[in-house]
């Protein structure tokens, strides 16, 4: 502890010790938190009574995923429907952009036509962004259309890393960083979607990965956003709940231990256990400026 620097926290106006650094923990076997998520039992909510402080950002807003997540549970929207809904989003968000951004698929001609039609409107808000996998081939679509920001799927739980990606933590981190670096090389701002964060090893993978992202941001002077995705709807807002299920704990880890500014953090929740609204407002209270939503209550599985 004596080697850690003392600094003035400009947010609290208190002298604080420099945070402990968390290196990547590269494991041979996946940590799937079977003690919390047993296949034959209801998922458990465990507590350790570690309370983290509120950290309300100076400004909060909404981002939209109607044309991405919102289409994954229903028949795809037509181009005309997308343009009409985008118009609604513009009106709902108002001139100050409370609905800050909207994300689009780029894979089909219909998707790309919708993007071009919405771009033609010239609205400042919601800004049009895209969603891609961590693939350099996918990134070519973003460059072709000329968007300024894209979401990138970066699955972060060992369920996804080992069983879907069939890689180790270090291998998948290197893959993600290579795609993100290519984004930065072309001047495009990456938004990293931390898929399945509520089943991930927060301090063994998520925080070390986000620390590397913040280093890239310092190097390229281009914002890198972090979207915390509660893919299974397992997040809880109860004080003292353990990570990875604790929404306050996740946001605290991102802001305090990874050094991600509030304005670069979004929460993306699901409503499987009817906690999407509670968890979203909790994310705001604990330091995430953005909450990712879908119109009409429509989203993958439960909205």
Positions of predicted regions on the chain:
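Catalytic cores and adjacent flexible loops of soluble metabolic enzymes
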Residues: 1-303
């Amino acid at each position: 502890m004596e080697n850690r620097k003392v600094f003035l926290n400009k947010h609290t106006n208190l002298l604080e010790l420099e945070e402990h650094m968390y290196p990547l923990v590269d494991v041979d076997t996946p940590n799937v938190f079977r003690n919390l998520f047993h296949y034959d039992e209801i998922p458990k909510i465990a507590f350790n009574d570690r309370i983290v402080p509120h950290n309300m950002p100076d400004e909060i807003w909404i981002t939209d995923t109607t044309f991405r997540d919102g289409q994954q549970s229903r028949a795809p929207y037509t181009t005309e429907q997308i343009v009409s809904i985008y118009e609604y989003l513009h009106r709902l968000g108002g001139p100050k952009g409370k609905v800050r951004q909207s994300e689009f698929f780029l894979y089909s001609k219909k998707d790309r036509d919708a993007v071009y039609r919405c771009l033609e409107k010239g609205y400042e808000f919601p800004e049009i962004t895209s969603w891609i996998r961590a693939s350099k081939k996918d990134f070519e679509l973003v460059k072709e259309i000329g968007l300024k920001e894209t979401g990138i799927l970066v699955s972060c739980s060992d369920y996804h890393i080992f069983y879907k990606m069939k890689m180790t933590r270090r291998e998948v981190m290197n893959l993600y960083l290579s795609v993100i670096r290519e984004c930065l090389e072309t001047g495009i701002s990456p938004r990293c979607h931390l898929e399945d964060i509520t089943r991930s090893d927060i301090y063994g993978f998520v925080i070390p990965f986000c620390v590397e992202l913040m280093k890239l941001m310092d190097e390229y002077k281009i914002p890198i956003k972090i979207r915390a995705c509660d893919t299974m709807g397992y997040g809880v807002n109860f004080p003292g709940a353990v990570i990875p299920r604790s929404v306050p704990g996740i946001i605290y880890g991102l802001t305090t231990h990874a050094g991600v500014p509030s304005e670069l953090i979004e929460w993306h929740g699901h409503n499987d256990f009817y906690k999407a609204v509670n968890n979203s407002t909790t994310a705001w209270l604990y330091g995430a400026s953005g909450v990712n939503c879908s119109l009409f209550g429509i989203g993958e599985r439960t909205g």
